[in-house]
Regions:
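Metallocofactor- and cofactor-centric catalytic cores in central/energy metabolism, strongly enriched
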Residues: 1-144
Length: 144
């Protein structure tokens, strides 16, 4: 049996780079790599993508995934990402979409530093993007 091959696409917002929030990337990029390695440890081949922020970056990532014949695209919202940048491109590909909804922060109990919210608001992008995928008739699965 053939092992799965995924295109692993992190979604991000360009605004954070534009205003100099490098500390977010410094934490999110290693977590992305941790997740990619976790897939690989389970025998899944992972084709990585740079963090995608704008339409052209999403288009380039999907084109690359298609060119190397991945079995599906796994998205991960590293932060809220405006869905108008990604949804049309994801809806147009023939590749199946799996939306991975997870964060590095396990819980938000009373002792949690409220700054963690800045690293865990991707769910808003998940809801936005999946709404547009559904409107476009693009099937997807959610893994949380």
């Amino acid at each position: 049996m053939k092992n799965a091959k995924i295109g692993f696409m992190p979604l991000y917002i360009k605004l954070y780079d534009d205003v100099g929030l490098a500390e977010l990337r410094e934490r999110l990029e290693p977590f992305y790599e941790t997740m990619a390695k976790g897939f690989e440890e389970k025998g899944i081949e992972v084709v990585r993508s740079p963090f995608c922020r704008i339409e052209s970056e999403f288009r380039d990532a999907v084109a690359r995934f298609e060119s190397v014949n991945v079995d599906c695209i796994v998205t991960w919202h590293a932060a809220y990402s405006p869905s108008l940048e990604s949804a049309k491109i994801l809806a147009e590909t023939d590749l199946p979409i799996i939306v991975m909804d997870t964060t590095e922060t396990y819980d938000f109990g009373p002792a949690q530093d409220s700054a963690e919210i800045n690293l865990c608001h991707g769910i808003h992008g998940v809801m936005d993007m999946t709404n547009l995928l559904m409107r476009a008739g693009k099937p997807y699965a959610i893994a949380a």
